[in-house]
């Protein structure tokens, strides 16, 4: 199992921490990614161009370089590619695979579980083999197949099931033959246009959810700052703030920092066009 416990008794946080043993999973030195596919990332600390906080709990992370990931897989259709390496990516929970096409082009893709260096993969708009890493339209993938990196719109690039260990299962086509029905890992059942592409297999790094962070410093290294309770703030900072001592919320329901109803209250706009594509939500309720 690639989860490794940190053997140290210097403090209680480290004593209970676990990490992923990347030496068993990766095939290349993490300090040597493909330079032609790297972009420098500027840190914003959750601030906008006015210096105001727009995303809370961000700031102070380690420096990163962004790996340009090919989510579309349409640039080199029907050209066989070879997996050259499986690498760590600090910008996502899964691993990425560096592939080289027969014409010499290189690109990064989300690494499926079970793929190895030297494996051949292919992307096509026509029916091809059902193997991990092969990309094709949903119309050509049989029922029961696990897929990831699923497009919401044809040729728009994969947007669904891209994080570690995630996938969706194909349930079949609808009665019109225009859509393919997928069950997402959240439990939601949804329709996708059959022209949308998906990649066969489950996303790599299945044990990501088993990692125990253990101490605050590891999250600070990742750029995650502390989360403060609203009831501990002043009334001008949060709807729950103020009062003498530990005061109750004082409202009919808990609120977000922006005054919106929170915890168990449905906030989805049912007039969105995509509502018609959802068959059952993640709670199993019929739409």
Swiss-Prot record:
Coiled coil feature spans: none
Family annotation (InterPro entries): NA-bd_OB-fold, Rib_uL2_dom2, Ribosomal_uL2, Ribosomal_uL2_bac/org-type, Ribosomal_uL2_C, Ribosomal_uL2_CS, Ribosomal_uL2_dom3, Ribosomal_uL2_RNA-bd_dom
One function term, GO molecular function aspect: structural constituent of ribosome
PROSITE patterns assigned to the protein according to its UniProt record, in alphabetical order: RIBOSOMAL_L2
GO cellular component labels: large ribosomal subunit
Record Gene3D superfamilies: 2.30.30.30, Nucleic acid-binding proteins (2.40.50.140), Ribosomal protein L2, domain 3 (4.10.950.10)
Region of interest (Disordered), residue spans: 222-266
Keywords: Ribonucleoprotein, Ribosomal protein, RNA-binding, rRNA-binding
Gene Ontology process terms (BP): cytoplasmic translation
Role noted for this protein: One of the primary rRNA binding proteins. Required for association of the 30S and 50S subunits to form the 70S ribosome, for tRNA binding and peptide bond formation. It has been suggested to have peptidyltransferase activity; this is somewhat controversial. Makes several contacts with the 16S rRNA in the 70S ribosome.
Family from the record: Belongs to the universal ribosomal protein uL2 family.
Assembly with partners or alone: Part of the 50S ribosomal subunit. Forms a bridge to the 30S subunit in the 70S ribosome.
Protein name, UniProt field: Large ribosomal subunit protein uL2
Taxonomic lineage of the native organism: Bacteria, Bacillati, Mycoplasmatota, Mycoplasmoidales, Mycoplasmoidaceae
Protein encoded by which gene: rplB
């Amino acid at each position: 199992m690639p989860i490794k416990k940190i053997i140290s008794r210097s403090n209680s946080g480290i004593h209970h921490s676990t990490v992923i043993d990347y030496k068993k999973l990766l095939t290349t030195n993490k300090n040597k990614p493909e330079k032609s596919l790297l972009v420098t990332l500027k840190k914003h600390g959750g601030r906008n161009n006015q210096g105001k906080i727009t995303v809370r709990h961000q700031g102070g992370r380690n420096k990163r370089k962004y790996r340009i990931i090919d989510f579309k897989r349409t640039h080199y259709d029907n050209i066989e590619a070879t997996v050259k390496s499986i690498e760590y990516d600090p910008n996502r929970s899964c691993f990425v695979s560096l592939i080289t096409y027969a014409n010499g082009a290189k690109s990064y893709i989300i690494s499926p579980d079970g793929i190895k260096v030297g494996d051949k993969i292919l992307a096509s708009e026509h029916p091809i083999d059902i193997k991990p890493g092969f990309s094709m339209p949903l119309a050509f993938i049989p029922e029961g197949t696990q897929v990831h990196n699923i497009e919401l719109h044809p040729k728009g690039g994969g947007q669904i099931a891209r994080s570690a260990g995630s996938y969706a299962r194909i349930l079949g086509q609808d009665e019109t033959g225009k859509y393919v029905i997928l069950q997402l890992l959240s439990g939601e059942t949804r329709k996708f246009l059959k022209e949308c592409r998906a990649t066969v297999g489950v996303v790599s790094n299945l044990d990501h959810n088993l990692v125990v962070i253990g101490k605050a410093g590891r999250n600070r290294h990742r750029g995650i700052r502390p989360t403060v309770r609203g009831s501990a703030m002043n009334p001008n900072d949060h709807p729950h703030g103020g009062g003498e001592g530990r005061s109750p919320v004082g409202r009919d329901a808990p609120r977000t920092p922006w005054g919106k109803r929170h915890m168990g209250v449905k906030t989805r706009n049912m007039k969105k066009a995509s509502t018609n594509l959802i068959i059952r939500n993640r709670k199993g309720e019929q739409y």
